[in-house]
Structures are given as structure tokens and as C-alpha cells.
């Protein structure tokens, strides 16, 4: 740009656009699928694996974000450049195994709670409850195949207990405030939908007796 010269030119024939007869306020957009430059195509070795398959001794019956971090560290140590995973967005509709299809998400922003690394969320002070989850962890990890419903039920039980223990502190923290302000545009509707979905026992908002038509001020009364 500073030298006012082109670094490279496309190799394909020139594009032609017939003189269109556009009406006032009309816009014509021509989109080409490819651009043709003599630029070497980047190549890199990598691995394709779904996060739920990364189960380790630290997991709770399913691979989680902690396991993904360990996978990334391994990929770096073996000089791999790419890790391809399946979608990890929240697909929760009925809390049943039918929610396990990764391509049927309810949000393009929210991650599936199942992938949360429990060990990174804090330790339960209730020793009896902590012992119960340690036992459940071994049971879930020992299964020959992932039990979607059992995993999610266990993790949600932990989420509620750790929120009861640490929730007030987290909600009052500056870090949460920054996260909330940066993401509230999608976070609030997602939270309200999730609450109403469970309250009315269906993800089909058309069947809800109330709030079936989106109204932010009214709907947000359900937020804490």
C-alpha cells in the first residue's frame, strides 16, 4: 500500500458485469465463490476428535474443557497445528439422551454445560457431598460408553451445590461483571429461555402458557 503497487494479480479471466438497469434504492451484489491467486495453500497436520471422547481420569464420564486443554498441550508437543472438534454448543431441550445430537443447538453462543470442568469450578466444602461426587466420578468414568443423562444429572447437581456455596461471591466479582456486560445481549435471552423451558417442561415456546412472545422487559423479571 505504501509503495502503491499490487503484490499479486488474480489468474482467472477478467470478470464482466453487464450494465444492469437498477431502480432507485436497488443494490446489485455479485459474489464469487473463489479468488484465484498464486499463493501457496497452507497445510498443517492435526487431529479430528469430539470433545466428549477426550475422557480422562479427571473427567466426570465425558471429555470436558479441561481435557481439551490437555489435548491442545499434547498437540503442541507433537508439533500438530490443528484440532477439529464437533460443535460444543448447548443442545439441552428435554434433559434426555435425545439432546445429545451436537448439531441441534439452542444457542450459537452458549457452550453445553456438560463440558464444564468441575475441578475448575471449585471444591465443595461439604465433605460428605464431595465424597459422593468422587464416588460418582469413578462410576461414570468406569462405564464402557458415555451415559449422557447420568453425566448431565450429576454435573447439574454439582452446579447447584457449588453455586449455593460460591454464587454470591462470583456474582459480586468484577470478573463476572465484565463477562456479563460483554455478553448480556445473548446471555440474558438464553438464561430466560432455559428457565422457561424447564418451568414449562418443553422447549417449544409456542406451547408455553406465558411468555411465548418475546418481550425483554417482562421476560427478564425471571432473572435474578
Where are these regions (language model features)?
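Short, solvent-exposed turn/loop segments enriched in Gly/Ser/Thr/Pro and often Arg
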Residues: 84-94
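Conserved phosphoryl-transfer catalytic core
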Residues: 121-148, 155, 159
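Short, acidic/polar
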Residues: 64-72
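Conserved, mostly hydrophobic/aromatic
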Residues: 75, 85, 193
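Alpha-glucan (starch/glycogen) binding determinants
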Residues: 1-35, 74, 97-100
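Aromatic- and acidic-residue-enriched segments that line the glycan-binding/catalytic groove
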Residues: 93-123, 185, 194-201, 205-211
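An acidic-aromatic substrate-binding cleft motif
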Residues: 38-55, 60
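Conserved small/polar residues in nucleotide/adenosyl-binding loops
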Residues: 221-222
Amino acid at each position: 500500500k505504501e509503495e502503491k503497487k499490487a503484490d499479486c494479480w488474480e489468474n482467472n479471466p477478467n470478470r464482466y458485469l453487464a450494465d444492469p438497469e437498477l431502480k432507485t434504492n436497488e443494490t446489485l451484489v455479485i459474489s464469487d465463490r473463489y479468488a484465484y491467486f498464486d499463493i501457496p495453500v497452507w497445510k498443517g497436520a492435526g487431529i479430528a476428535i469430539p470433545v466428549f471422547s477426550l475422557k480422562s481420569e479427571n473427567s466426570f464420564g465425558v471429555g470436558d474443557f479441561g481435557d481439551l486443554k490437555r489435548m491442545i498441550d499434547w498437540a503442541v508437543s507433537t508439533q500438530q497445528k490443528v484440532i477439529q472438534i464437533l460443535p460444543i454448543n448447548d443442545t439441552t431441550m428435554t434433559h434426555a439422551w435425545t439432546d445429545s445430537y451436537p448439531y441441534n443447538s439452542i444457542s450459537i453462543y452458549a457452550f453445553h454445560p456438560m463440558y464444564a470442568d468441575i475441578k475448575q469450578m471449585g471444591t465443595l466444602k461439604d465433605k460428605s457431598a464431595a465424597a459422593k461426587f468422587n464416588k460418582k466420578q469413578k462410576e461414570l468414568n468406569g462405564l464402557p460408553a458415555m451415559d449422557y443423562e447420568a453425566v448431565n444429572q450429576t454435573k447439574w447437581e454439582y452446579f447447584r451445590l457449588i453455586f449455593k456455596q460460591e454464587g454470591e461471591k462470583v456474582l459480586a466479582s468484577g470478573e463476572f461483571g465484565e463477562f456479563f456486560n460483554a455478553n448480556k445481549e445473548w446471555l440474558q435471552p438464553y438464561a430466560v429461555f432455559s428457565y422457561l423451558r424447564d418451568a414449562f417442561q418443553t422447549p417449544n415456546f409456542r406451547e408455553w402458557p406465558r411468555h411465548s412472545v418475546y418481550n425483554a422487559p417482562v421476560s427478564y423479571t425471571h432473572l435474578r
